[in-house]
Amino acid sequence: MTTVIDGKNVAASVIQTVKSATAALEKSSGVTTGLAVVIVGDDPASHAYVGSKGRMAKECGFKSVQHTLPADTKQEDLAALVAALNADPSIHGILVQLPLPKPLDSEAIIQSILPEKDVDGLSVVNAGKLATGDLKTGLVSCTPAGAMVFVRRTHGEDLSGLNAVVIGRSNLFGKPMAQLLLNANATVTIAHSRTKNLAEVCRNADILVAAVGRPEMVRADWVKPGATVIDVGINRVAAPERGEGKTRLVGDVAFEEVSAVASTITPVPGGVGPMTIAMLMANTVIAAHRTAGQTPPQF
């Protein structure tokens, strides 16, 4: 019987831990966890994301601050705001909603956030800490951190003897995901668009993670029977059966056929997606605990 991971349920349990840790920190050291979100311009999708992040932060008991700037904001003004938030001791996490409107240089802004407040886990310092196995002081990018929660809850903390294949080598997901699996003692292969015999490589995986943005690319005959399959892809495809011009969301994995082979699988939607905001909250409360000199919660 295949287990279909309910991402909403797992995310809710992460949020529960965040709430408890937030309340405990406030009680023990008087520190209220603070998250600042910066959004530039009026992209509706970005505003929807930021709104849901702000609501979740308040639900967790955080001090939640949103800075909304016009689309024609100058680079130096945005940089000055980030510098002010870096210097504000009541703010433990800073998130700049991407993409930024042109001609703003998002990379310069992201790298200017203090690594200890970089709750998106995008700074080169946090990437470097993950690469050297420093999970004690670094912050991990939210989507791979969320996918790793699924892996740990399925296989435990120690992945010794298990083969993991990550399809995708992006800095945002593929590389950090591979590092997390490696840190947990899995034997890791990173596959990508130039990999030969991709299906054959995937068939060796006890844990298969797909993150390339190609709809339903991973088929049943790519998957080792009994494998754990984590689908990070999110693709909108035509769904004429729903009516003219209608679409539906699918992952990088052909869910119906692969779920007949895998022992554990994440659906799209409702799998990895809900974990991203949950891990953003987790990173923020971890950052607050570190600032206060307290041991952060485990997720």
From Swiss-Prot:
It catalyses: (6R)-5,10-methylene-5,6,7,8-tetrahydrofolate + NADP(+) = (6R)-5,10-methenyltetrahydrofolate + NADPH; (6R)-5,10-methenyltetrahydrofolate + H2O = (6R)-10-formyltetrahydrofolate + H(+). SUPFAM superfamilies: Aminoacid dehydrogenase-like, N-terminal domain (SSF53223), NAD(P)-binding Rossmann-fold domains (SSF51735). Pathway: One-carbon metabolism; tetrahydrofolate interconversion. Pfam families: THF_DHG_CYH, THF_DHG_CYH_C. Its EC number is 1.5.1.5, 3.5.4.9. GO terms for cellular component: cytosol. InterPro entries: Aminoacid_DH-like_N_sf (IPR046346), NAD(P)-bd_dom_sf (IPR036291), THF_DH/CycHdrlase (IPR000672), THF_DH/CycHdrlase_cat_dom (IPR020630), THF_DH/CycHdrlase_CS (IPR020867), THF_DH/CycHdrlase_NAD-bd_dom (IPR020631). GO terms for biological process: L-histidine biosynthetic process; methionine biosynthetic process; purine nucleotide biosynthetic process; tetrahydrofolate interconversion. One of its GO terms (molecular function) is methenyltetrahydrofolate cyclohydrolase activity. It comes from the Bacteria. Catalyzes the oxidation of 5,10-methylenetetrahydrofolate to 5,10-methenyltetrahydrofolate and then the hydrolysis of 5,10-methenyltetrahydrofolate to 10-formyltetrahydrofolate. HAMAP family: THF_DHG_CYH. Belongs to the tetrahydrofolate dehydrogenase/cyclohydrolase family. This is Bifunctional protein FolD. It comes from Rhizobium leguminosarum bv. trifolii.
